[in-house]
Amino acid sequence: MLRVAGRRLFSVSQRSSTATSFVVSRDHTLSDGGGDSSSAPRSLPSADLSSYHRSLIRGFSSQVLAQGNEIGFGSEVPATVEAVKTPNSKIVYDDHNHERYPPGDPSKRAFAYFVLSGGRFVYASVLRLLVLKLIVSMSASKDVLALASLEVDLGSIEPGTTVTVKWRGKPVFIRRRTEDDIKLANSVDVGSLRDPQEDSVRVKNPEWLVVVGVCTHLGCIPLPNAGDYGGWFCPCHGSHYDISGRIRKGPAPYNLEVPTYSFLEENKLLIG
């Protein structure tokens, strides 16, 4: 609309200059015609000019309205439909994908279905194997399950002696206590201990004491039947444990750990 108005204004200015030159030349012609200036009316050129301007304005308005109707203004057709009717030459469409592929040979459809079905079956089989392999790798192996629990025969352990076995990579002390050892363990004032525990809490059978042979200070292995209290002594930093595995002296903060165990038979012990 603005472009049309600009073009029309430019044409009107040209026509106005032409009309002005025409009127001026006519005025000069009248003045040069030898007639008396008083006999010729002075308002004639201005009347011609005003009428000419009015005709130009009417023509301009009619042409603008006609142009507006041509580009879709004031028409009943939507702008989108009008744009489709008058496409722009700058819009370029890619027609390379408008070609239709030729239909395949009907006799080869069975082969294509067979190939697709076979590929899907192979893919499903490989996926199943991968899932099974992942599940099996997450489960514990037989060696790990065997190390998770340890069965110990207690028949060969003499009273007053300590046996060391390996369980989950750690030493485990199994001590068969005598009657004097049991009395000594129960005679201790629990309130004076650094890590107070009753002896009955640490054993299931008073005759057998089972503890993990790792010092609770820095992980050294204490020596059995040593120390000031007849239990275990850690040579690394001088921690002393009594006959129940409780810390009595030295830098160790806690008692020796008691693992999970149970008695299968009278002389069978299962650790873990």
Swiss-Prot record:
Signal peptide: none annotated. Keywords: 2Fe-2S, Disulfide bond, Electron transport, Iron, Iron-sulfur, Membrane, Metal-binding, Mitochondrion, Mitochondrion inner membrane, Respiratory chain, Transit peptide, Translocase, Transmembrane, Transmembrane helix, Transport. Its main location: mitochondrion. Coiled coil: none annotated. Residues 61-109 are mitochondrial matrix. Its cofactor is [2Fe-2S] cluster. Disulfide bonds join C220-C236. Component of the ubiquinol-cytochrome c oxidoreductase, a multisubunit transmembrane complex that is part of the mitochondrial electron transport chain which drives oxidative phosphorylation. This is Cytochrome b-c1 complex subunit Rieske-1, mitochondrial. It comes from Arabidopsis thaliana (Mouse-ear cress).
